[in-house]
Amino acid sequence: LGDAYHTALICARLNLADGIAAYEQSLRDHCRRSAKYAYDALETVGLGMCAMLAALVHDMGKACERFMEYLEAAFAGKDVRRGSVNHTFAAVRFLLERYWEPAEQGSVRIWTAEIVAYAAGAHHGQFDLNGPAGGHGFEHRMTKKDICYQEARDNYLRECADIKELDAMFDAAAGEVERFFETVSDNIDIAEEDEECDFWTGLLARLVLSAVEEGDRRDTYEFMSGKAQPECDVGNDGWSGLSARLDEKIAGMECRSEINKARREISRMCREAAQKPGGVYRLN
C-alpha cells in the first residue's frame, strides 16, 4: 500500500467543517467508540462483551480501497448509490470463519459465533437465517463474491483490532452467553433442537443487535453533529416523563390523510384499552 492510500484507508466517513473543509473519522475510532457505547448498553445485564465484539467488527467491510473511493465520490457530490459498496458481510464471514467450528456443533461457542455474527451483520437491516423462499442468510454472506473480503479483513486486523484482542473478546462473550442460558431456564439444552431455546436465542440476538445499533448510531451522530450525546440513565421514575414527551410529539403531528386519521384512532383505542385490568382479549 502506498502512503496516500494507507492514510485514506482508516477513514470511516467524511464531513464538512464550517461548510467547506472536509474532516475525517478513522475507521478505528468509529469502531472502538461504537464498541464502547455498545458495551455500556448491555454491561449491566452481563452481555457487554457480546455487544462490544459485535460493534467492534461491524464495519470491517469498510477497510478497503473500494469503500474509500465510494466515500470520496459521495463527498465530492458525484452520483453514487447509497449502499452500493457492501460493507456488512465481512464481519459475518470473519466471525464464522474464525469461531464457528463444525466439531463444536451445539456448543456455547457455536451459538456465540452466530449471535455475534448476526448482530454485526444486521446493523443496517435484519436478515432471515432461513427465509420463506429458501436460502440461508449466513451461507449467503459466507459465499458472496466481489466484496473485497480478504483485503478488508487484513486491513482491519492491522489498523483497528488484532486477532489476539478479538479472540480474548470472543472467549469472554462465550462465557456471557453460557451464563445467559443458565439464567433464563434450567430446562434449555442448547445442544438439542428446542423451540424454547430458539426463542431465547432470537431475543438475545436482537438485544445484542440493538446495542450495536445504539453504539453505531450514537457515534455517527456525535461525529456528524460535532456534539457529544449526554449520558441518559432513565430508571423507573423516568418513564412517565418520556411518555408525556411522546404524547406531546404525537399531538403535534399533522393528521390530514385518511390513513393517518385511522392510525390516530387506533392509537387512542390502544391507550384506552391499556387502562383495563389484565386478561385475555380478542383483537377485532
Model-based region annotation:
Residues 1-249:
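Accessory nucleic-acid engagement/destabilization modules that flank
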Residues 239-242, 259, 263:
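A conserved cap/lid and substrate-binding interface adjacent to the catalytic center
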Residues 17, 276-277:
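Intrinsically disordered, low-complexity segments enriched in small/polar residues
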Residues 277-284:
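Walker A/P-loop
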Residues 264-276:
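Pre-Walker A adenine-sensing motif
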Residues 23-27, 251-262:
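Dynamic helix-loop-helix/coil hinge segments at AAA+ ATPase domain boundaries and subdomain interfaces
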